[in-house]
Amino acid sequence: MPTRFGEVLAHGTTMLDVVYTNESREMPYFLEQLKERWLDAEMDHEKFLGLDLEYTADQRGVAVIQLCFAHHVLIFQWASSDKHCPELMDFLRSDITFATVDITNDKLKMRYNFGIEIPTGCLIDLQTVFRLRHVRTSMAHMAVALIDEEYGDRKTNFPKSQHKLWEKALLDRINIEYAAKDAYVSYELYRKIRVVNYGQRHLV
């Protein structure tokens, strides 16, 4: 499957630049773009990535891995790849900070599927750093509160049947959009939370 480049409307007028691939041999280049061109150029307090996983139909395996920095999203379809990408494993185990929502399940899936763990302190659980009235605030609740009200309809606008198609190559357009937005929301939520916390620390 050839690598595909495109744009996804996140919300309002916010556009995401999206790379979608299942080619393991091309991943080192795209990961280098994330780490060196964008990540290393940012201020220290902005050095983190949004991370999200989509699961196989039986919920046991990782089907898709999404990484986001600012408006740049990389979608790697692990399920339809050759499942050999040591550069990605090294990237996940490096000292980069990742922000995600479903941290418990994602950690278990990475341990079971990849045999790796993101280092302690490098995986931020957004559900522990930001809570509404819910015991475990969902990504949708957080996105509505901090990013845009449009995210309140995300689950209802994405048919349940599509959740069983993350292993399909080529992914449907609606799945690509959903995956890109999930990764972006993970990034943008943590960015906004950090901005608020930074401002509060400097209020006198």
Predicted regions, residues:
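N-terminal accessory regions of nucleic-acid-interacting proteins
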Residues: 1-49, 81, 126, 195-204
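Short acidic, Gly/Ser-rich segments with clustered Asp/Glu that frequently serve as metal-coordination loops
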Residues: 48-60
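A short alpha/beta connector and helix-capping loop motif
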Residues: 58-73
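Nucleic-acid-processing active sites and adjacent nucleic-acid-binding tracks
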Residues: 72-92, 96
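Acidic beta-strand-to-loop metal/phosphate-binding motif
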Residues: 96-103
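Short alpha-helix plus adjacent loop in nuclease-associated cores
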Residues: 124-148
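Acidic, Mg2+-coordinating catalytic module of metal-dependent nucleases/exonucleases
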Residues: 144-204
